[in-house]
Amino acid sequence: MKFISTFLALFMATVAANAQKYIGGDISALTRNETFNPTFLDKNGNTVSDPLDIFKSEEMNIMRVRLFVKPSDYANNDPWACQDLEYVKELGKRIKDKGFKLMLDFHYSDTWADPAKQWTPKQWETLTDDQLYTKIYEYTKDALEQMKAAGAEPEFIQTGNEISYGMLWGKEGSSSLKKCFLGSSANWSRFTTLLKNAGKACREVCPSAKIIIHTERAAQTNVLTNFYDRMKSDNVDYDIIGLSYYPVWHNTSATRETAIKTLESRKKKKNIMIVETGY
């Protein structure tokens, strides 16, 4: 899900009672916005050269940046889906240099990944499942190594974006997309193997980073808990339950609180973060 007209998409709050509190936003579009020579104003109307200084003054402490595999390969290229590795390394270092924590959001696609679309990157479309298991490990490892070398090591890593129905479904328009549904066993082993291989790379390169498994089913508590039960039964290694919460789709805040409290009671070893929201 995305709102490209919004410069700062507020997102993060850890909600477990004893957890470190984080608040921040997704500023993936910042570098592109700056190509239009905008003027940034603080809440008092004063011009500020770097908007990160505004966020810091408001006591934000974490920023998220999305990463696409090769956005230039996507046929219907969206100019706002421009966050390739070089872009993200530069922005990530800038975030870290300002003293923020960095959340890196792997989309594992050339374009936006969300519950309606999880298209396999063009360069990966002909790979078998076994080859994809190797590719996601190698790609994740290489990207993280490059981020570290650039001074942009993330403290939080999303291995997928809103992956409620799986990831790397196949080529857009294919009649045999490899989606996952909770009422069926089809493709779940494939999906969780992909997650485990991505997580393995995260542990090797960034052992202190927290791995986030991100879904958007905050309005459906039973579906949400069943999803994370599946992560447990398939031994997926991760640290944080990441949720999207958009009132327009996910009903009231009471619905969100019900989902969170249920997860807290059933997943006592996992922290919970709202990693994406908008109003």
Segments (PLM) and residue ranges:
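Acidic-and-aromatic substrate-binding clefts and catalytic sites of carbohydrate-active enzymes
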Residues: 33-34, 38-46, 71-86, 164-167, ...
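Bacterial Sec-dependent N-terminal signal peptides
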Residues: 1-20
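Substrate-binding cleft and catalytic face of glycoside hydrolase catalytic domains
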Residues: 54-216
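Extended hydrophobic secondary-structure segments
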Residues: 21-35, 100-115, 241
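Glycoside hydrolase catalytic-domain groove-lining segments
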Residues: 49-52, 189, 200, 204-211, ...
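A structural micro-motif
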Residues: 20-21, 100, 209, 270
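Boundary/entry segment of secreted carbohydrate-active catalytic domains
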Residues: 20-54
